[in-house]
């Protein structure tokens, strides 16, 4: 959510900034609603004051034994008019809130201006793209040939966009989770956190998934209003909702492994085969809570921490700065890490690292006390995948395949697999 004061005082500036995203904000309509709000608030307060004065006068007249019926009728008329104006004011406030909750974040000045992913800017590359002397296979072809990845069985159990993994591939998948957690905890200093995988609407509103992106979520039946979490960013970031932190507590740096559940409502026909885009997948998430002045340095660190995982696994990747037309709604600035997939002959997203600035904190009322001014200020929140586990498995399978369809294990993962160094076709 954007700053209400900024919206009220300079809606045209907001409209200009959001237009960089391709988002149309009707500043004129918003300003008209604001004028109505201010007029109704002044009028309502005036009526309230007048009714209070007349009610007091009735009490004084009654104590003197005077006839108060004419005065009571006037107060009742004022009361009816006051209730009508309160109803009108409530409706205006609801309209303003609906607009405010629909607005995306203002992009940081360093974000490249562009329309879509074609306008994203490559920042750096790491690693050499492998050259194969044989026709490469996709991860799903490799996994099915190994007899350890079964999409048909998953479709039978549930439906499309699910997978069943068995044997060494399932073990490799689990090893990746432990490897990522160990690196982030032991070397990067994150605190591990375990959170619910089911969240309520308040949590989703706080991090920005609601109300705009409900179609992307799995909502549970029943009266609780619960949803399956689409990313552990949601429950982890909400651990500071409605809190006033001390400056000494910042930065907070959490790492969390969780399953994620997404309906992929807008991805019909995209990545229909394999594990690239699934309804259920695992992710190791990094979340930072910082002071405002520290958040952009934190974004660079968070991104580098995610990069370390790819470097340890010796997977070629690149870092891309997303343009204004491609960053997520709540983000002020985002770097994507894209890993090389030989079967597609291209880089694919494996992590998205974002600075949300105060966008989520304002919704969550997540604050800290500034020791220099003693003022209560909003924190900044950041998040990034460190990494998406399934896509990391995909990248290993494709980059470490040989001509026989075997998968060689990266050196960094061998200690987690009890000496297994190759997953072989039998």
Swiss-Prot record:
BP GO terms, sorted: selenocysteine biosynthetic process; seryl-tRNA aminoacylation
GO molecular function, one term: ATP binding
Localization in the cell: Cytoplasm
HAMAP family reported in the protein's UniProt record: Ser_tRNA_synth_type1
Substrates-to-products reaction catalysed: tRNA(Ser) + L-serine + ATP = L-seryl-tRNA(Ser) + AMP + diphosphate + H(+); tRNA(Sec) + L-serine + ATP = L-seryl-tRNA(Sec) + AMP + diphosphate + H(+)
UniProt-listed PANTHER family: SERINE--TRNA LIGASE (PTHR43697:SF1), SERYL-TRNA SYNTHETASE (PTHR43697)
Binding-site residues for ATP, renumbered to this chain: 262-264, 349-352
Protein name per its UniProtKB record: Serine--tRNA ligase
UniProt function note: Catalyzes the attachment of serine to tRNA(Ser). Is also able to aminoacylate tRNA(Sec) with serine, to form the misacylated tRNA L-seryl-tRNA(Sec), which will be further converted into selenocysteinyl-tRNA(Sec).
Broad class of where this protein is predominantly found: cytoplasm
Chain residues that bind L-serine: 231-233, 285, 385
Pfam families: Seryl_tRNA_N (PF02403), tRNA-synt_2b (PF00587)
Keywords: Aminoacyl-tRNA synthetase, ATP-binding, Cytoplasm, Ligase, Nucleotide-binding, Protein biosynthesis
Recorded GO CC terms: cytoplasm
Gene: serS
Domain description: Consists of two distinct domains, a catalytic core and a N-terminal extension that is involved in tRNA binding.
Subunit relationships: Homodimer. The tRNA molecule binds across the dimer.
């Amino acid at each position: 959510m954007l700053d209400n004061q900024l919206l009220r005082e300079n809606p045209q500036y907001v409209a200009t900034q959001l237009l960089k995203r391709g988002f149309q904000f009707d500043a004129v309509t918003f300003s008209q609603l604001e004028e109505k709000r201010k007029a109704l608030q002044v009028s309502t307060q005036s009526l309230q004051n007048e009714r209070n004065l007349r009610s007091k006068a009735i009490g004084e007249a009654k104590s003197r034994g005077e006839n108060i019926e004419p005065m009571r009728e006037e107060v009742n008329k004022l009361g009816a008019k006051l209730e009508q104006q309160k109803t009108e004011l409530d409706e205006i406030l609801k309209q303003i809130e609906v607009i405010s909750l629909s607005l995306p974040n203002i992009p940081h000045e360093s974000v490249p201006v562009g329309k879509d992913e074609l306008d994203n800017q490559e920042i750096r590359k790491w690693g050499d793209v492998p050259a194969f002397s044989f026709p490469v296979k996709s991860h799903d072809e490799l996994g099915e040939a190994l007899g350890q990845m079964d999409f048909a069985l998953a479709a039978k159990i549930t439906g499309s966009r699910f997978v069943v993994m068995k044997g060494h591939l399932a073990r490799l998948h689990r090893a990746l989770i432990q490897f990522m957690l160990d690196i982030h905890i032991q070397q990067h200093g994150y605190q591990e956190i375990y959170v619910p995988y089911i969240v309520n609407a308040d949590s989703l509103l706080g991090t920005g998934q609601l109300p705009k992106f409900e179609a992307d979520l799995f909502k549970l039946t029943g009266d609780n209003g619960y949803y399956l979490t689409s990313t552990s960013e949601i429950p982890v970031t909400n651990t500071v909702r409605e809190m006033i932190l001390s400056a000494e507590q910042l930065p907070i740096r959490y790492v969390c492994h969780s399953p994620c559940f997404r309906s992929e409502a807008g991805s019909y026909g995209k990545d229909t085969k394999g594990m690239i885009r699934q309804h259920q997948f695992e992710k190791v998430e990094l979340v930072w809570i910082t002071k405002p002045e520290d958040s952009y340095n934190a974004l660079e660190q968070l991104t580098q921490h995610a990069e370390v995982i790819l470097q340890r696994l010796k997977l070629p990747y690149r870092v891309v700065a997303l343009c204004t037309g491609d960053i997520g709604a709540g983000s002020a600035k985002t770097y994507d890490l894209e890993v090389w997939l030989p079967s597609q002959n291209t880089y694919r997203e494996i992590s998205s690292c974002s600075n949300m600035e105060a966008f989520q904190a304002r919704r969550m009322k997540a604050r800290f006390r500034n020791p220099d001014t003693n003022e209560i200020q909003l924190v900044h929140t950041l998040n990034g995948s460190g990494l998406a586990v399934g896509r990391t498995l995909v990248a290993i399978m494709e980059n470490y395949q040989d001509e026989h369809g075997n998968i060689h294990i990266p050196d960094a993962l061998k200690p987690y697999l009890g000496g297994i160094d190759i997953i072989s076709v039998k």
